Amino acid sequence: MLKGSTLKALDVRILWPLIETRSAGKCKLHNPRPTPNRNIAAAKLIVTLRLLLSCCSGGHQRSFSSSTHRSYITFNDFRKKHRWYTKKELVGYSMQDMYSVVSDVSNYHKFVPYVKRSDVHSRGSEGFKADLIVGFPPLNEAYTSQVTLVPPSLVKSECHDGRLFNYLLNEWSFKPGLKDIPNSCVLDFKVSFEFKSLLHSNVANIFFDLICDQMENAFIQEVRRRSGPPSIRSHVLTSDRS
């Protein structure tokens, strides 16, 4: 969680710029004595940040300095509603090990961060539909995803009907790993989404990488729980984001 001094720094350097930006991409700082309505908006954003940090920390204490944020956050980031993230990694589990966990959508609520409920229905030869509730009290979002399966190499989830975002795409693909180590594979993880609200986008942008890493790690930890220790240490091959 954020320490008091860090939260004050966020109020001045991050929270106010998030609330109002110029169309040209330059941030307009507010008067040191903001109006009551702006105080309310900032307070809501602080609560959202606290909730995000609480979920991202996984129960461990984390502290963030204002200099860290200044190094990685630009005013253009605050204007983005569309984000994407890709990561290719060599892991010490077989394609089937990874596929069996990622395709187990009905149990996402047991091990995937932010997923509170996951129900599968409308099964077909190429996949199924899944109703999910994600979020953290008191904020929750319900949506339906179309999940496409190509065992044991692909799990693709798409949603275009969410109230929180315009679309959400999540794709996992698996390819053979090292020839001399059968229990290894190369996983390619991709996530792309666009929020309807610029305010939600701004909050997510601050912790975008952290959230993506935490979600990916949740699947790896679940594979470890089911299949045991990995055959080799994982190695990140490529990683990129918008």
Curated annotation (Swiss-Prot):
One of its GO terms (cellular component) is mitochondrial inner membrane. Its main location: mitochondrion. Keywords: Membrane, Mitochondrion, Mitochondrion inner membrane, Transit peptide. Coiled coil: none annotated. Signal peptide: none annotated. It holds the Pfam family Polyketide_cyc. SUPFAM superfamilies: Bet v1-like. GO terms for molecular function: ubiquinone binding. One of its GO terms (biological process) is cellular respiration. It is a peripheral membrane protein. It is found in: Mitochondrion inner membrane. The keyword Transit peptide applies. Belongs to the COQ10 family. Required for the function of coenzyme Q in the respiratory chain. May serve as a chaperone or may be involved in the transport of Q6 from its site of synthesis to the catalytic sites of the respiratory complexes. Interacts with coenzyme Q. This is Coenzyme Q-binding protein COQ10, mitochondrial. It comes from Drosophila melanogaster (Fruit fly).
